[in-house]
Amino acid sequence: MSIKYLGLSEVNGPLVVLEGVKNAAYDEIVEFTVNNQEKRRGRIIEIYQDKAVIQVYEGTDGMSLNNTQTTLTGKPMEL
């Protein structure tokens, strides 16, 4: 089951921090919707309490703290 969040807490280089996260897992695949159209992917690389640090594969340029939609897919990274 996927869970969606609106907004980000912090953007720093290729990493973003999402607060208020529940039931997230290490290495979980994350999908971002930027400006209601562009899709990007990433994975959770650290979880602490209700915060998740996510590595964004396509970079964070143009990602808004207020309008970026984040979807936790509930699926681990697979090769």
Name every feature range the model reports, one short phrase each.
Residues M1-K4, E10-L79:
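Acidic-enriched and Gly/Ser
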